[in-house]
């Protein structure tokens, strides 16, 4: 495909870590060209002023957010905005013929009352929200292919659901016993100035936050309920760890059949994800490490059973900025456009 045939795409909210990760991926994607970078606080600045390491590749200036301009230039728009802003823009962009991928929480929920309860914003875009597809390709690949609006999952839900989904879909566990212990690097908190993300605060320290009230909880529960066929509640506790990238999610649950052994579960997981090119099921006795996924769109999954407690333990590792954010959005873009799912997405990590 020649340069003139590339699909023009735009990013509104390009100044954050998710935005710059999108820029990196789209620059190397053979089917797209970046036609617009937009923002509010950074409007008027050359993009290389925000990220000098891209000065030799990106000559664009961050522009004020003007949806008429965006729609006139772009067939596809990524929204990398704080929660509560995309829902004001997506309906207009879709009405103008754009495909939209939202990286915030605005279009992740089927029930907008749940969104309002957890994100404290009333919504009037019910019709648009009803068209949104949850952007986890391993579960909703077919729906994504025909969608015009994608609600890209959060980083914690991605890692957690990749670990939990086969257990729930196949009825292998007692759903009410599911516990998720997840740990994330500091880039998940964004690029804004936050005291707890300062090196002096985060280095050498490990702590939980959002205990019993993290906003990703209802998102996880919505998909778990879909898979189980009835309402499911999970115990989810996130932790901040002193590294930049990565999420390790450890899921514990009681087996419905205590006689089920690890090798049986490994076989079930391998079959469940057999058509998922980014999921790597590890052999028994090998457990995932976040470093393996750095800079890639991969998800590594390790499995163990504990016959003493009749529980299964599933661990998943992803790069929170890739499979947990920008990489997964590009994966969804590929499916929406009918391209190879892996197109433009790295599968080789930074190592060591």
From Swiss-Prot:
Query: What is the protein named?
Result: N-acetyl-gamma-glutamyl-phosphate reductase
The lineage's top-level taxon is: Bacteria
- Hey, which pathway is this one from? Amino-acid biosynthesis; L-arginine biosynthesis; N(2)-acetyl-L-ornithine from L-glutamate: step 3/4
Q: Which Pfam families match?
A: Semialdhyde_dh, Semialdhyde_dhC_1
- InterPro entries named among the record's database cross-references: AGPR_AS (IPR023013), AGPR_type-1 (IPR000706), NAD(P)-bd_dom_sf (IPR036291), NAGSA_dehydrogenase (IPR050085), Semialdehyde_DH_NAD-bd (IPR000534)
**N-terminal signal peptide:** none
Q: Where in the cell is it found?
A: Cytoplasm
Which residues does the Swiss-Prot or TrEMBL record annotate as the active site?
Answer: 155
Q: Which gene encodes it?
A: argC
Q: Which UniProt keywords apply?
A: Amino-acid biosynthesis, Arginine biosynthesis, Cytoplasm, NADP, Oxidoreductase
Task: Name the reaction it catalyses.
Answer: N-acetyl-L-glutamate 5-semialdehyde + phosphate + NADP(+) = N-acetyl-L-glutamyl 5-phosphate + NADPH + H(+)
- One example GO MF annotation: NADP+ binding
The protein's job, in short, is: Catalyzes the NADPH-dependent reduction of N-acetyl-5-glutamyl phosphate to yield N-acetyl-L-glutamate 5-semialdehyde.
